[in-house]
């Protein structure tokens, strides 16, 4: 809780919007079960030769987009990803895996959020906002969480495949 006290109002608002987009995505995906059909290939259906490093590279590159846009992209990305995933799982009668998918997504998206907060260092200088965040540590933790999410995702794909 001490960490939350150190965040600026802008960062707190962003975190609330970030978590809201995740919840809205899951709700939208469970209501609209045909949502995934518009872009079936975009949800990471396992391919031949999937590995932890391929999953990590894909998720890490998306997270660099978060960094470059100071996290704004992640609000849409959360909604889109979780809508597709929830909708796909319902259509495959595999909704029981949703908690695992949420765990994986949460690790990866919190990692992305940490990397996005790293992008706030630029915004902070631009708007002359002062915070006590160590952006190098945030970047490291973000990358580590994305890697852990990739490992769990790989293990899930192997068990389902």
Predicted regions and their residues:
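Terminal transmembrane helical module of multi-pass membrane proteins
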Residues: 124-161
């Amino acid at each position: 809780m001490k960490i939350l006290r150190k965040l600026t109002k802008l960062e707190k608002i962003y975190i609330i919007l970030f978590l809201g987009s995740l919840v809205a995505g899951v709700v939208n995906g469970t209501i609209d079960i045909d949502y995934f059909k518009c872009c079936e290939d975009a949800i990471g259906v396992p391919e031949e030769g999937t590995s932890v490093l391929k999953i990590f590279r894909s998720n890490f590159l998306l997270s660099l987009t978060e960094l470059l846009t100071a996290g704004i992209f992640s609000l849409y990305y959360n909604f889109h990803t979780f809508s597709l995933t929830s909708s796909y799982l319902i259509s495959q009668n595999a909704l029981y895996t949703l908690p695992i998918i949420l765990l994986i997504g949460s690790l990866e998206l919190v990692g992305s959020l940490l990397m996005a907060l790293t992008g706030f260092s630029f915004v902070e200088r631009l708007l002359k906002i002062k915070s006590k965040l160590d952006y190098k540590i945030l970047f490291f933790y973000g990358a580590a969480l994305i890697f852990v999410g990739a490992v769990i995702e790989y293990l899930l794909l192997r068990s389902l495949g």
